[in-house]
Amino acid sequence: MATTTRLTIEDFEKLPDEAVKHRELVDGELIDVSGNTGEHNELKDLIISLLRPLVRGNKLGRALTEQEYDFRGNVHGPDVSFFGLEKCELYNRKRRVQRFVPDLAAEIVSQNDTFESLMKKAQRYRDCGTAEVWIFSIETRQAYLMSDSRNVILDEDQEFRPETIPGFSIRLGELFDRI
């Protein structure tokens, strides 16, 4: 019976970029994740372009795309993430995997994602200390928000106001209309 060696985050970081592209580390194993479509990338880029000026201008912390984090030994790179000033001193630009979790993780539903797998990932984010998780569905033009105070599905006619980034607000339909 063959034994499988489980990878650590340190092992993951030593792998060449091409070996980990479109992969995450889950329970010691490399898991393939689907590549992004054009509209997926456009929504990700739009969200970060709206967040960054607010985050930087108000000195709230950092807003990043596809930054990988350590979720208790698992490596995930949310499409968009944010962490506040108190975590900025932990941020190491030269490190592939940050040794903390973001305050906010946003995922955009990809064509190969299942609801079950996304909810499992979102719950892992929350269980590891991420305060707020956003899941955007381009197909249904909805967003699902998870936090301590609410778990809610927003439709395109509703205002999107996250708790983790004060001052950010946009009608969800307007967000989808801009891609």
Regions found by a protein language model. Give the residues of each.
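Gly/Pro/Ser/Thr-rich low-complexity, intrinsically disordered segments predominantly at protein N-termini
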Residues: 1-179
